[in-house]
Amino acid sequence: MAIRVYKPTTAGRRNASVSDFSELTRSTPEKSLVRKKSKTGGRNSYGRITSRHRGGGHKRQYRLIDFKRWDKDGVPAKVAEIEYDPNRSARIALLHFADGEKRYIIAPKGIKQGDVIETGAQADIKPGNNLPLKNIPTGTVVHAIELRPLGGAKIARSAGAAVQLVAKDGAYAQLRMPSGEIRNVDARCRATVGEVGNEDHANIQLGKAGRARWIGRRPITRGESMNPVDHPHGGRTRGGKPPVSPWGKGEVRTRRPKKASNKMIVRRRPSGKNRK
């Protein structure tokens, strides 16, 4: 992937950049692997906003991605197409399996049209192959990792994401996350070799507010610029208050302190002065 930077012909073009999409081989999705995707505007079933700053944006169709792959052990697949997916930052690859079935997977870095991909404990260690962590050598970079055996990939699915297998200890494998955290995962969990492609996605500059609206992001308004009825910071009276949310709550941790998976964390992610 490469990034195309626009010339500053207008204010909205200045510093704006976009992917050149040179790695894509097809512009329309596989019809049998597409489903309707309805918009919520960040509202729940009661119509109340539960996720702020969402709404609008271009219509999308959901592509069915295979995050499990364990039911295709021993069945080789050929990479037929590399496609764009509006629902995620990574590209997706269309696989044609030897038994005639077609499926989408997250496209790993370096994969190309015509490559053959394998699934199962006996698969080779090469990008795109999916196998249990216990069968992957220490030091290998992986992505699309399960948290529980046969639970489907949950970790490292976005563009450029990569996790390193740093050790194996009995029934567990130790993974170094993108955040720097090291945690244990059941060694029977599956992972895909390599890192996720489209790694330059983080370097793209939208350049103007309109491009944010195209992808469904609404503006963020400061509480201080609101009226008192809308936010505790609203109104002209300034100072004397600690920062709070629109509902008057101070800063709180978002992770439950007694979460069951805490015991799987070997070393927490660096924070504050320790963050590199």
Curated annotation (Swiss-Prot):
Subunit structure: Part of the 50S ribosomal subunit. Forms a bridge to the 30S subunit in the 70S ribosome.
Sequence similarity: Belongs to the universal ribosomal protein uL2 family.
Compositional bias per record (Basic residues), positions renumbered to this chain: 255-276
Name of the protein in question: Large ribosomal subunit protein uL2
GO molecular function terms noted in the UniProt entry: rRNA binding; structural constituent of ribosome; transferase activity
Record's keyword terms, sorted: Ribonucleoprotein, Ribosomal protein, RNA-binding, rRNA-binding
Segments of skewed composition (Polar residues): 16-27
Spans annotated as Disordered: 14-58, 219-276
Cellular compartments per GO CC: large ribosomal subunit
Species for this entry: Bifidobacterium longum (strain NCC 2705)
Signal peptide: none
Function according to Swiss-Prot or TrEMBL: One of the primary rRNA binding proteins. Required for association of the 30S and 50S subunits to form the 70S ribosome, for tRNA binding and peptide bond formation. It has been suggested to have peptidyltransferase activity; this is somewhat controversial. Makes several contacts with the 16S rRNA in the 70S ribosome.
Record PANTHER family: LARGE RIBOSOMAL SUBUNIT PROTEIN UL2M, RIBOSOMAL PROTEIN L2
Domain of life the protein comes from: Bacteria
GO biological process: cytoplasmic translation
